[in-house]
């Protein structure tokens, strides 16, 4: 629509109500169809009145030759009309692509795996961010000024941070213990995998709360900013790296099955220190990876990145580096380790 034009637009050929740009000109549906049919038939048209006929909504059918000429004068382009053969080829390709998308479906085993992951995630992780408000947040964290729901004074930001992070790790541990494939591993391997992946799984889950517009984490009635992390004691350079990771991942607009499969891939990493059953854990990670790949392929490609799976693998590798840096940060924030013995054990 032209700037400053609020009313309905008129067809450049006959003056009827225009429905949009067709073949490079603003026209109504009638003139669009007329132009397509006339050009496709490729019949010679001649005006009996030397091209002087008036073309408007009432008289547009009286002289096809003058109507066609007015279409061309308005800017409609013949070369934008596909031939019948080209149109048939395009429709065939579209049908083929739809068939390919439909063919890429999860196997029964993969469907059951996804349902198991989603169930455990819903029970222990899905609602944990709404519960942060229970840990006596400082008043400035509330998105809207409101009273605390409990008659206790707020905690200092550092203590609140320690409590919500301990709570997140506890919920992630419950999530993993709810997975039969994880419980089937030896206890020493369960501990090694959890020590390596707990923080990574927390951040994969936390990404669902990240707001791209404000670069904040929105957890129920609370809002956490980069500045809050600085006040806790994290280095700003590390926080910028962390927030860039979250922004990149959030832009992919992942669905919940994709998030939980990413988390499962992080969990079943055979190269974690202390792992003994490397081959079995490698097999489990491959199972998660193939399921994620199949799930992505089975989704319609509209608004999806063609290389989404490869980019998610890259982000998992980046998250590993962030995890290592996070452990270093935790160790060097004065007083924080003593408040978070569980996280201290995870990061050691």
Swiss-Prot record:
Keywords assigned: Activator, Cytoplasm, Cytoskeleton, DNA-binding, Metal-binding, Nucleus, Phosphoprotein, Receptor, Transcription, Transcription regulation, Zinc, Zinc-finger
Organism this protein belongs to: Pusa sibirica (Baikal seal)
Subunit structure of this chain's protein: Heterodimer of NR1I3 and RXR. Interacts with PSMC4. Interacts with ECT2. Directly interacts with DNAJC7; this complex may also include HSP90. Interacts with CRY1. Interacts with CRY2 in a ligand-dependent manner.
GO molecular function, one term: nuclear receptor activity
Function: Binds and transactivates the retinoic acid response elements that control expression of the retinoic acid receptor beta 2 and alcohol dehydrogenase 3 genes. Transactivates both the phenobarbital responsive element module of the human CYP2B6 gene and the CYP3A4 xenobiotic response element.
Positions of post-translational Phosphothreonine modification: 38
Domain NR LBD: 109-348
Biological processes per GO annotation: cell differentiation; negative regulation of transcription by RNA polymerase II; positive regulation of transcription by RNA polymerase II
InterPro entries tied to this protein: NHR-like_dom_sf, Nucl_hrmn_rcpt_lig-bd, Nuclear_hormone_rcpt_NR1, Nuclear_hrmn_rcpt, ThyrH_rcpt, Znf_hrmn_rcpt, Znf_NHR/GATA
Name used for this protein in its record: Nuclear receptor subfamily 1 group I member 3
Domain-related comment: Composed by a short N-terminal domain followed by the DNA binding, hinge, and ligand binding/dimerization domains.
